[in-house]
Amino acid sequence: LEEVLKKTNVTQAELDAIVGAEVRQRGPLNWEWVQGILKAIDQHVPLSSGASIAIATKDVYQYLCNAAIANQINDGVMKAMQPGVPTVVVSHSLGTVVAYNLLKNKGSALGWEVPLFVTLGSPLAVTKIKQMITPIGHPACVKKWFNAMDERDIVALYPLSKKYFQVAPQIENKTDVQNPTENRHGISGYLGDPEVARRIHAALT
C-alpha cells in the first residue's frame, strides 16, 4: 500500500489530514493506517480509485466488471425474493452492492416489497463504485434503509450519508459499531451489535 501511495503523489499532509500523524507513525500494523491510505487514494487520485477497490474489495470489483459473475450472483438472489411478500433484506460487504443493484433496478418491476433494507460494512460510497452504479438513488421498493459501519472497517470507507451517497429519502446511518473481528469487517461483528440486531428483529416481528 505504501508503494501505491507513493505512485499517486498523495502528500504526507493529505494523508495526515485523514488518518492523523499518530496513526501514520504506527504504520501498517493497524487497520486505521490501511484505511487511511485507501481513503487518501480514493479522495485525491480519482483515476486510481479502482486500485483501492481491487486491494480491499476484490469480490466487489469482479461483480461490477464481470458480467458472467454478476449474472450468476444476481440469479441466486432473485430466486430468494417473492413478489408481493414483505421481505427484510440484510446485506453485508459485496452483498450490499448486489442487493442495492437488484432492488433499485428490478425491485419495483418484479413486485418486491422491502420494509427494511439493512446494509452492513458497505463499500457503496467508494468513488469508483458510485461511478459504476450511476445514477444512484433510493430503491423505490424499499421503505426504510438502515446502514451500519465500524469507522475502522477498510471496506466501508464512508457512511452512506448525504455527503458521500446522496439519495432521497436519506439513509439512516449508524457509524459507531465496534466490530470485534480482526479486520473490523466481519459480518458476525456487525450482527452482534445490539442496535443492529434490534433493528432487524423489530422489522421481522
Walk through the language-model features, giving the residues of each.
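N-terminal accessory alpha/beta regions
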Residues: 1-17
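Lipid deacylating catalytic domains
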Residues: 18-90, 96-205
